[in-house]
Amino acid sequence: MSAKMMFSLGVAAFLFAGCPKSDGNPFTPEEGAGSTPQTPVPAAFVGTWYNGSISLTNFYNPTTGEWSNAVGSGSFYRFNQNGTFEFGWQMHVSLYGCTNIGMVYRRGTVAVQDSVLVLYDQYARVMAQDNCSASRNYDRPGTISTETLVIQPGQDEWGNTGLYIRAPNTDYSWFLQNR
């Protein structure tokens, strides 16, 4: 082996040996494993929570690629005890004979630390339909991303139990539990 190759291998071995190991904290995950952090979700957050007027029935089927044909606008989060989540967003607007529909579906894992949830997408899909301009229609993979939420259980003015959910540095939005 050439001296240059030996030097390169030595530098690579040094850098690899010096890589920090995971400290077990899901908020500092190891790189390159292909998996995303996942912790159990506290019972107070487990369930399907919605904001707005959105149908949660067959919102999106990842197996068939079919979207629901429901109307309304809103979003939902579904947090499972095993540390997984689903998110859906829908906007349905009709004006001057044109109907525009936009939908987003994401699923993945969640890491929880107190009232902070970090959502790690493993799958995302977006769809848009415009009945007045078919060239604007699409159904494609969404951007895989990470989302941080701050969650606070609470009660609205009518006594309904729900979650106040916000992104850092934003105001809370009220989400009711789907029962």
Task: List where the protein language model places each region.
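Bacterial N-terminal signal peptides that target proteins for export
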Residues: 1-7
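C-terminal motif of bacterial Sec signal peptides marking the signal peptidase cleavage site
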Residues: 15-18
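Lipid interaction determinants
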Residues: 20-106, 111-113, 118-179
